[in-house]
Each structure stands twice: as C-alpha cells, then as structure tokens.
Design a protein with these regions (language model features):
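Alpha-helical multi-pass membrane segments and their bilayer interfacial helix-loop junctions
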Residues: 1-323
Length: 323
C-alpha cells in the first residue's frame, strides 16, 4: 500500500514526531554545471549556424540591404525565442548569440551606407538597443542593451562636442538608476539591468578613458569639431563629477532620514565635499567611491565588488600615468 506525502505527514504528526504544516514539494533545480554546459551548447549551436549561413550567403556581408534585412530578422527571431522559451538555458543562450549576430549585421549594413555619419549610425544603434531592452525580458541581454545603447549614445554626443562631459553624464545616469532601484517595485529588475549596464560602461571608461580620451580629442580636432566649453571643458566636467558626488551623499542621507544639521550628516557632507575636491584632479576617485557607497547603501555585493575593483584599477592606472 502506497502512502502519499500528505498522509504520511499526518501520521507522523499524530505520533508527535513532527509539528506544523507539511512542507511544500521541493522545487527541482538543474545543477549549475548542467546549466553552464547547456548555455555553452547554445552558443556553439548559434555560431555554427551563423558560420554556415555566412559561408553559404557571403553576399550578405557585401550588401547593405541584405545585411540590414538579415540582421533585423535575426534580432526578431531572438526576440521570439526569448519571449516563448525564456526559462530554457540552451534556448536563452542560443537566442542571445543570435541577437548579437543580428546587431553586428545591422551595424555592418549601416556602415556600408556611404552617406551616413558615425553619429547617425550610433543613434540608430542606441534606438535599436532601447527597443531590444523593452522587448526582451532576459536580464543579461538587458544589461548588454543598456551598456551598448548608452555607449552608442555617448559616441553620438561626443561627435557633437560633448565629449568632455560624457563621463559625468554616465555617472549621473548610473547614480540616478541605483538611487531609484526601489522607487518602483514593479520595475526594479529593469532598473538594476540599466544600473549594471551603466556601471560596466563607467568602469570601462575609467580604465581606458585617459588613453582613449587623448586619441578622441586628436580625432575631433582633425575633424574640426569644437568642444563645448573650450579650454575650460575638462575643469567643468570634473566639477560636475564632484557635484554628483555631493548630490548622491545628500540623497542617501535623505533616504536614511539623517538631517544635514546633525553630526553624522555634517560629517557625511564634509567627506563628500573632500572627495569632490579630490575629484577635480582625479575624477575617478569620486566615481569609484560612489560605486562603493551605493553598493553598500543598497546591500549589493556585486556593486561593492565592482567598486573595489574599479578603485584599485583606477589608482593603478592613475599612478602609471604619473610616471
């Protein structure tokens, strides 16, 4: 005679061996190594398929129209897979690879249109990533869309003379996203995806920003693009970063109910002003300290780890640049 779990629990309870309600059926989870292998298999399958298509239809890479059509089709297929098979590891990774390939084909097609400038291509890419962010609910893909879409927008604005202020702009957007993580519970997952995408872009800018910035400035000079603010642009940008540091500390104090007239509030604002002054000479100090601060305030270990990594990486890079 077989006994179900509920009856067995009732018998044990009558004998005084257990107490309380019967435990729910355990949720069966796939081991992490199996999920990893399924994800890798999805990428391998997608790239084999794309390699076959690339060899058999080489004309796609040579025609702007064909590249745009095939790229858009791949993005559409990836969106369909994400929305219908969102829980499968193989399917989600396969769709992610298809989406990346589609995005690369779209960029390839846009670059082959001779009349289009870099800023126009970057704006189209930013709009594409915004659309994919809204259509695809996969968290990792959303982080990718937020990072690449923001990077494309930065590239477009840089070509219009806003290059010195881009780090401050990314920093402000990052701070706003994480300070409002819990403001809209229904959208908290999307806000976190935006926040992670922006912090990755911010860290990349901190690590390679100095070298890339000098190269970018030379390119803009040759292209005849004048920077807004002229010779004062770097100082204005550094002052903006310092102001954002003070603003973040002020918002966190308000959130915690600490008055500025109290001793802890005065100490926090004083420390923020000190970091802001240091940031005028080394903007990365203020940026990385805020990443650490927001990570600690929100209880986010990933942000804390990224903050520590970015602080150490920036200090190493800054020391190297002083040599």
């Amino acid at each position: 005679m077989s006994v179900d779990a509920g009856s067995l629990w009732g018998m044990l309870k009558q004998e005084g061996l257990v107490e309380g309600e019967a435990p729910r059926d355990p949720v069966t989870t796939t081991p992490w190594f199996v999920r990893t292998m399924l994800g890798i298999a999805g990428w391998i399958g997608a790239w084999f398929l794309l390699g076959f298509v690339g060899v058999g239809f080489a004309f796609v890479m040579k025609s702007a129209t064909a590249a745009l059509v095939v790229g858009a089709s791949l993005c559409a297929v990836a969106t369909f897979i994400f929305r219908t098979r969102a829980s499968g590891d193989f399917a989600s990774q396969f769709a992610f690879a298809l989406s990346l390939a589609g995005q690369m084909l779209i960029v390839t097609g846009l670059t082959q249109i001779g009349s289009w400038q870099i800023s126009s291509i970057a704006l189209v890419l930013a709009l594409l990533q915004a659309a994919l962010f809204l259509l695809i609910q996969n968290f990792i893909h959303r982080v990718w869309s937020a990072m690449t879409g923001s990077g494309a927008l930065v590239m477009a604005l840089s070509n219009w003379g806003f290059h010195p202020y881009m780090q401050a702009g990314i920093f402000a957007a990052f701070s706003w996203a994480w300070l409002n993580e819990f403001s809209h519970p229904g959208r908290s997952t999307g806000m976190r995806a935006i926040g992670y995408g922006l912090v990755l872009l911010l860290i990349a800018d901190l690590i390679i920003g100095s070298t890339a910035g000098m190269t970018r400035s030379l390119w803009l000079d040759r292209a005849g693009i004048s920077l807004l603010g002229g010779a004062f642009a770097p100082w204005i940008a550094a002052a903006l970063i310092g102001a954002i540091v003070i603003w973040v500390v002020w918002k966190l104090l308000l959130r915690e109910g600490v008055a500025l007239t109290e001793e802890p509030g005065l100490a926090a604002i004083g420390g923020a002003v000190l970091v802001a002054l240091v940031s005028i000479k080394a903007p990365g100090i203020g940026v990385t300290m805020v990443i650490l601060l927001i990570g600690y305030a929100n209880g986010n270990r990933v942000l804390i780890g990224l903050g520590i990594f970015s602080l150490l990486a920036y200090l190493s890079h800054y020391y190297y640049m002083l040599q």
